[in-house]
Amino acid sequence: DGIFVNPIDSSKLTSLESAREAGIPIIAIDASVENKDLIDCVIESDNYDAGVLCAQDMMKRMQSADIVLLKHSTVESAVSRIQGFVDTIKNYPQYKIIDSAECEGQLERAMPVMQNILERHSKVDVVMSLNDPSALGALAAIESMKRTNILVYGVDGTPDLKSLIKQSPLVAGTAAQSPIQFGRLAAKNMYSILNRKDVPEIIEVPVTLITKDNIDTFNVRGWQ
């Protein structure tokens, strides 16, 4: 009767075209699609603000920084996160993006690409990662190469990264999403669609930056 989809590629969604032709309602969760006509509603974090929050926190901590970006450029939500970060620092030349790499948001991809970046650059101060798994990969690379003066940011608020915020001086923070809220909103809005009620085209869920300053107010073992 209805489909929930979490796109990992915003453009390659031929199966949704078939579902749309069949009149099946579709809600996208956590990431949108290029062709908005294929879906009834998208429920996602304020991904742009996630990047903004990470950049603002970095600027409070550091007067200048050489920055690396870990990206996933085929996913709209990941692009928005990195763009929010980049836009926040663009008028401050003391914050320089010295390198970037695609890692598909995966720990296993992020670790080797981060190792390659560290081999190219003797000075890296900050890593802005599109999500927490890539932040964990970056952290593994940094630790393996004994580069202990680099701060890492992620986006998600996963239990793994929240635990490391408490334990590791290298983990600066994560802009936390709320999958629990996603699920509630998805179910509520699909029910409305099936009952022929109008729903918003876009529902943005606020994000919260988790750092050492506020980590004790969050459930480290679970999601928000």
Go through the PLM ranges and name each one.
Residues A50-C54, S77-Y95, R109, V113, ...:
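Short, solvent-exposed amphipathic alpha-helices that sit
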Residues D66-K71, V86-E108:
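Short beta-strand elements in bilobed, periplasmic/extracellular small-molecule ligand-binding domains
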Residues V42-I67, V79-S80, R109-M111, T158-K162, ...:
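Hydrophobic alpha-helical segments within soluble ligand-binding/sensing domains
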Residues G2, S10-D49, T158-V171, N219-R221:
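Flexible loop/hinge segments that line or gate small-molecule binding clefts
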Residues G2, P7, D40-C41, D66-T74:
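Short beta-strand segments enriched in small/hydrophobic residues
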Residues S77, T88-I89, S178-Q224:
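Hinge/cleft segment of the Venus flytrap/periplasmic-binding protein
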Residues G2-R20, F85, D99, E104-S163:
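Hydrophobic alpha-helical
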Residues I27, V68, I98, L151-Y153, ...:
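Structural detector of well-ordered beta-strand residues that form the stable sheet scaffold
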